[in-house]
Amino acid sequence: MDPTDEPGVTEASARYLVAVFRLWAESGRRASTGDIADRLDVEPSSVTDMLGKLDAAGYLDHAPHRGVELTPSGTEFARALSRRQCVVEAFVDGLGTSIGAERAHAIGYRLPAAAVDRLGVESDLDCWDRCRAGEDRLDDCAKLAGVGPA
């Protein structure tokens, strides 16, 4: 899957999809506009605008005052984007340096699928072992890996 081939999804909107996906994985509930704004360090009005676009494109269901949840296609796409970011972070960490989540997302978004797969092989690390949910939330790691409920 190459995100640049996905109609209607820019690098910026992909950040929102990943944020909604990770918030759901961490909490198991719909993400609020405020949660997304905090996660991305943006204004709630910016979140509302972007969620409207992603809702219209069919990637998520945004119900004002009830939160946001990804559609099946949004979940699949966000899971793939999240994996890309994780692979880039794992590879760079393996080199003994760090680039941060924002930069890893940008690089992961732009790289061709074959390059991401190659980095995953070169990092010699199961990306999902790096789940940010913490050891007490192993079920969330399974969700991120795609083996939990979607």
What are these regions (language model features)?
Residues 55-65:
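A short, conserved structural fragment
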